[in-house]
Amino acid sequence: MSNFSKISVANDPRTELHDSLGLTGAEISINHLPAGGSVPFVHHHKTNEEIYIILSGRGKAVVDGEDVELTTGDIIRIAPDGKRQFFAAADSEISYACIQVKAGSLGAYTADDALIEE
């Protein structure tokens, strides 16, 4: 068994990576909305926060009724209770990664969790 997983992602509207990468601590999806498109529902989560990384394009998130403009390179974190919906700009598609993890579950990270090989 290998210590890594690698896949390539097509330009599909949504690709969930938990099964294809064997994820055990997070859900990651890659999402594409055409110009003028939107996620067709408002949602929030029971326990998971979401981190959205805008890979290309422009659009907005509506979080608890507030418009948040988004463009390439922006990153937005939304708490579990935040009611959210995503929209592409009328003249631009948008592509983004969504990382979903249980809020409050991060026990160690980066240098605190790394074991440096000699």
List each model region and its residues.
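Short histidine-centered beta-strand/loop micro-motifs
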Residues: 18-20, 40-45, 87-89, 108-109
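Short, conserved beta-strand element in jelly-roll/cupin
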Residues: 32-33, 44-62
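Ligand-binding loop in jelly-roll beta-barrel domains
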Residues: 80-106
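Short, charged beta-strand/loop "edge" motif centered at a coil->beta-strand transition
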Residues: 29, 38-41
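Short strand-coil-strand connectors
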Residues: 24, 62-66
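Histidine-centered metal-chelating micro-motifs
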Residues: 38-39, 60, 76, 81-86
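Short acidic-glycine-tyrosine-enriched beta hairpin
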Residues: 65-81
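A short, N-terminal "cap"/entry segment at the start of jelly-roll beta-barrel domains
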Residues: 1-26, 35, 107-118
